[in-house]
C-alpha cells in the first residue's frame, strides 16, 4: 500500500477551489427567501451569525445583527456577571410588551434614576413601592433640567393618578392606539391588584415597524446567544446566561469532537433541557454524529479556516472548509440539526458556496469586525481608519480568558501558552447594516443564478472544480482598479 492510498482519506477543497454552476432559473434575486434555522428551535430571517469573539460581538453588535434578522453570539472573555449583563441589554433593547420592565423604588434619588437610564439606555422608568405596586413613572424629560441629584424621584415623577394605564388583556395593536390617542410614549400594564406587571413603549412599536425582519422571541424581544467554554464554572456561567434571557448557548471550543466537550454537553442538556445548545467547532461527519447523539441542537463547523487562526500551521490539523461543511452536512442529513459554517469567508460568493455545500447559516467575524458596532479598538494607520481584530487563540485573547477554548486553562504562565491565532487590524467598514446589505445582496444574486428560491433548494446546487488560473480569471484582471466597490477588495 502506498502512503496516498493508505493515509489520504479525502480531498480537501475550500471556497476558492470551486464555483457554483448556474442553472435554469425562474427565481429573481429580490424574491428569494433567506430564512433559515440557527438551531433546532431558533429561526433566522437571514443566515448570518456574528462570532463569539471579543473584537466582534458584544451587546451593540448582537442588537444590530438581530435587528437585521440574524443573531449574535456574545463572547465569554469577561466575567460571568458582565456577560449576563450584556445578554440582558440585548433582551431589553426592544420589546413587544415588556413583562419584566426595569423599575426604580419609591424614595430613590434623581442620581439613581439617571444611572439606571444610562445603564439600560432607556428614557423612562416605572416607579414602584416595596410590594411592587405602581406609584408613578419618571422619564428623562422629568430629569432634564434637574440639578439636585439627591432629590427623591417622588417629587419629580408623574404620579399614578395622572398616568394612563392598561391591563394585561390589551394586545400590542390596541396598546399602540392608546399611546396615539393620549399622545404618550409609555403605557404601564397593571394587574387587577394594582401591581405593575409590564410596560409598552412607543419606541418599541416604532422599531418593530422599522425592522420587520428582526429576529425576535415570542415576547417580541431580540434574540441573542452567548458563548461558554469547557471549564469548572461552565454550568454556573450557563445558569447566569439563561437567567439573563439568552435564547441559546454556544459551547465554543477549538475541538468539539472531544470527550470533555461531549460530557459537558450532556450535563448541560440535562440541567437546561429547555434551551438550545450549539456545539463546535468540528470538521468531520463523525464528530457531528457524536454531538447530535449527545444532544446538540446545532453544530458549528470550522477548524482553522479563519483569517486570524493559525491552528492549521501550528498544529498541522484541519480540513479545508468547503469539504468540512459538506462532510458534516452529509452526516446530519435527516436529523433536522442545523449546521453553522464558521470561518474562511471573504466575499458574499463564499457565503453562497458555504450554504450550497449544506450550511444553514454562516458565522462571520472578519467581515463585520470593522463595523461601527464591533467592540474592537479604532486605529488610525497611515491616515486610514481601522479596527482591531484578533483570534480567540491569539496570545492577547488567551490572556483575557479564552485559554480554555484551546484546552490550556491550566497554564498560568503566559510565556508557556501556545497560541493558535494572531492579532490584526481590518479596515473600518461603516455600519453593520451596510455590510449585511451587501452580503445579503450577493447571496440573493447567487441563489438567483442557481434557480434556488430558498436555502433548502440551494443545497441542491452543483459545483465545478477550478484551477488557480480559474481563480485569477474570477477576479478583476488586466486592469487597474480606479474605483473601489463596497463589496469587493483585491485579495492580498
Task: Mark where each language-model region is.
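Alpha/beta catalytic cores of nucleotide-metabolism and tRNA/nucleoside-modifying enzymes
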Residues: 1-24, 104-105, 167, 174-177, ...
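Bateman/CBS regulatory modules and CBS-like beta-alpha motifs in cytosolic regions of diverse proteins
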Residues: 30-44, 51-53, 82-120, 127-129, ...
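Short beta-strand/loop segments at the ligand-binding rim of alpha/beta enzyme cores
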Residues: 43-50, 96-101, 217-227, 268-283, ...
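Glycine-rich phosphate-binding active-site loops on the catalytic face of alpha/beta enzymes
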Residues: 67-82, 246-258, 297-315, 345-379
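Short beta->alpha transition motifs characteristic of CBS
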Residues: 74-79, 122, 126, 133-149, ...
Amino acid at each position: 500500500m502506498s502512503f496516498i492510498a493508505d493515509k489520504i482519506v479525502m480531498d480537501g477543497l475550500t471556497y476558492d477551489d470551486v464555483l457554483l454552476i448556474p442553472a435554469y432559473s425562474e427565481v429573481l434575486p429580490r424574491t428569494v427567501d433567506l430564512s433559515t434555522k440557527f438551531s433546532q428551535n431558533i429561526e433566522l430571517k437571514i443566515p448570518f451569525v456574528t462570532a463569539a469573539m471579543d473584537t466582534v460581538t458584544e451587546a451593540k453588535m448582537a442588537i444590530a445583527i438581530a435587528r437585521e434578522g440574524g443573531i449574535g453570539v456574545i463572547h465569554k472573555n469577561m466575567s460571568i456577571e458582565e456577560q449576563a449583563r450584556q445578554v440582558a441589554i440585548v433582551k431589553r433593547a426592544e420589546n413587544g410588551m415588556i413583562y419584566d420592565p426595569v423599575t426604580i423604588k419609591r424614595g430613590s434619588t434623581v442620581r439613581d434614576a439617571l444611572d439606571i437610564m444610562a445603564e439600560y439606555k432607556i428614557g423612562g422608568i416605572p416607579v414602584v413601592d416595596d410590594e411592587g405596586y405602581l406609584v408613578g413613572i419618571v422619564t428623562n424629560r422629568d430629569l432634564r433640567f434637574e440639578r439636585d441629584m439627591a432629590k427623591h424621584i417622588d417629587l419629580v415623577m408623574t404620579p399614578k393618578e395622572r398616568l394612563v394605564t392598561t391591563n394585561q388583556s390589551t394586545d400590542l395593536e390596541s396598546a399602540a392606539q392608546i399611546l396615539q390617542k393620549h399622545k404618550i410614549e409609555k403605557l404601564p400594564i397593571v394587574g387587577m391588584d394594582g401591581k405593575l406587571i409590564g410596560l409598552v413603549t412607543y419606541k418599541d412599536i416604532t422599531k418593530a415597524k422599522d425592522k420587520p425582519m428582526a429576529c425576535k422571541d415570542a415576547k417580541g424581544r431580540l434574540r441573542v446567544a452567548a458563548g461558554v467554554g469547557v471549564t469548572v464554572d461552565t454550568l454556573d456561567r450557563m445558569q447566569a446566561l439563561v437567567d439573563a434571557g439568552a435564547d441559546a448557548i454556544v459551547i465554543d471550543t477549538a475541538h468539539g469532537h472531544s470527550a470533555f466537550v461531549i460530557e459537558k454537553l450532556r450535563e448541560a442538556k440535562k440541567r437546561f433541557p429547555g434551551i438550545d445548545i450549539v456545539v463546535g467547532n468540528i470538521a468531520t461527519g463523525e464528530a457531528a454524529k457524536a454531538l447530535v447523539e449527545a444532544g446538540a441542537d446545532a453544530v458549528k463547523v470550522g477548524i482553522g479556516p479563519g483569517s486570524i487562526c493559525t491552528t492549521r500551521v501550528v498544529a498541522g490539523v484541519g480540513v479545508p472548509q468547503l469539504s468540512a461543511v459538506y462532510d458534516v452536512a452529509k452526516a446530519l442529513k435527516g436529523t433536522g440539526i442545523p449546521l453553522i459554517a464558521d470561518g474562511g469567508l471573504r466575499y458574499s460568493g463564499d457565503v453562497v458556496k458555504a450554504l450550497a455545500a449544506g450550511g444553514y447559516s454562516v458565522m462571520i467575524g472578519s467581515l463585520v469586525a470593522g463595523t461601527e458596532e464591533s467592540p474592537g479598538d479604532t486605529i488610525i494607520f497611515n491616515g486610514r481608519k481601522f479596527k482591531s481584530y484578533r483570534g480567540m487563540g491569539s496570545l492577547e485573547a488567551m490572556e483575557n480568558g479564552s485559554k480554555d477554548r484551546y484546552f490550556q486553562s491550566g497554564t498560568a504562565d503566559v510565556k508557556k501558552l501556545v497560541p493558535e491565532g494572531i492579532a490584526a487590524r481590518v479596515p473600518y467598514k461603516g455600519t453593520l447594516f451596510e455590510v449585511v446589505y451587501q452580503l445579503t445582496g450577493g447571496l440573493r444574486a447567487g441563489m438567483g443564478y442557481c434557480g434556488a428560491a430558498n436555502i433548502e433548494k440551494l443545497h441542491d446546487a452543483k459545483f465545478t472544480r477550478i484551477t488557480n488560473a480559474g481563480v485569477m480569471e474570477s477576479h478583476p484582471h488586466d486592469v487597474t482598479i480606479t474605483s473601489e466597490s463596497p463589496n469587493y477588495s483585491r485579495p492580498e
